[in-house]
A protein has these predicted regions:
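Phosphopantetheine-dependent thiolation modules in NRPS/PKS and related acyl-activating systems
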Residues: 2-38, 52-53, 57-83
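Two-component histidine kinase catalytic core, primarily the HATPase_c
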Residues: 42
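Residues within the DNA-recognition helix of helix-turn-helix
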Residues: 46
Length: 83
């Protein structure tokens, strides 16, 4: 499958639902920590879900730079492009 930013975002939004108990609308500008109250454990669980869904590895070293949904989609796209 050819992944576009929109398709990746759509899939990540689905994966985020268990971490979004308040049902906040997730946009590219959604702050994962402030808006969704994700802690480091939740973030690692999400990363594992993303790795399984997209069949990629997300280096832990990239996570401190991921604040928004847009950042997360960019990381996924970058890892997908590495094949």
């Amino acid at each position: 499958m050819q992944w576009t930013a929109d398709k990746v975002q759509e899939e990540v939004v689905k994966l985020l639902q268990p971490f979004n108990p308040k049902g906040i609308e997730i946009t590219p500008d959604t702050d994962l920590s402030a808006d969704l109250m994700m802690d480091s454990v939740a973030a690692m669980n999400l990363v594992m879900e993303i790795e399984d869904r997209f069949e990629i590895d997300v280096p832990i070293s990239l996570l401190p730079d991921v604040n928004s949904m847009r950042d997360l989609v960019d990381v996924v796209l970058a890892q997908l492009s590495k094949g």
